[in-house]
Amino acid sequence: MTGKEEQRVDEKRNALLTVGLVCAVLFVLGVADLCNSDRVYSESENRVLASRPVFSWESLLSGKYGDAYEEYMSDQFTGRDKWVGIKTRADILFRKKEINGVYLGSDHYLIGVNDPEKYTQQMEDSRIVSLKKLVNRWDAKVMLVPTADNILTDKLPAFAPCYDETRLLAKVKESVGEENYIDVYSALQEHAEEPIYYRTDHHWTSLGAYYGFLAWADSMGKFPYPYNTAGMKTVSEDFQGTLQSRINVAWTKDKIQYFPETEKKPVTVTYDFADTADSLYAPEYLETKNQYGFFLNDNHAFIEIYTGYNAGKTLFVIKDSYANSMIPLLTAHYETIYVVDLRYFNGKLFQLMEQYEPEQGMDVLVLYDCIHFLEDFKFY
């Protein structure tokens, strides 16, 4: 056998060994997937994982079954969390600036990617039509909080595309009118050099929520309760939020802080018409990955808050999770606060509001971040 023939044999053998090794790995992983029960929830990613889709010929022919099964396999893949972390380290090594929907910003900021092509004018207009119904019926105040990519622009990688939320905010302001629009964008922009967003999570911090509270008070013509920002209490120094979960590697740790003045008077908090607590905070969440759940015991369809302040004053809040860290600041101005999260509430919104509206009326606040307003603001 000549040297060239031996080389070809070696190459063929190596190729077969490689194919065999890959097949063996895939076989082992496949067996592991079959043996392991599906996970319902990812603690590291703080989200519900996709479950096995139900087969039907209709869903198969439409392509929906294939898409759902692909998502299911991606979520339930054995060792998924470790593989995500390995891929992230490789991407960082190759100096990638966007990983799994997260920009690696300067000063150790992780900033969520909001694709400008995803959020269309049609989507904006549809949400604004629903919003206008609330404003017309209830004289609602509207606060749409810009996400970090629109305020911390100096932290973004060069030329990083992001959805321009100022377009949405201008349309909302024009639609609902200046009297009902709360300009929190300007308030946050003015304090952009301060830690108003978490470095590893998509929410604003308690300091950011405080500036939102001041913007709300100004729009209402109220003298704001004098919370002391220098006196904020730190309850955690190892928070790593939703954005860190997406890249699944260790990152800078955030602090969870709150205003202790919100605990001066006793409160009664009822969650989902059943469970009752005597605090606006749930410290048990500080022992979990989802430490932001410390505020208002995470997310619930409906919350009732009774305080010792301002007899007869009632506020009804329609919100996403951004509101969770600001609502405690509002308790100094109302005796009763009702809170509904449309992502979990399946009833008729106006019917619920009419049921809880007192004879003397109530204030209504719509509080979302801009992205979740576009994605989740729907009611019946």
Residues of each region from the PLM?
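Extracellular glycan-modifying ectodomains
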Residues: 1-380
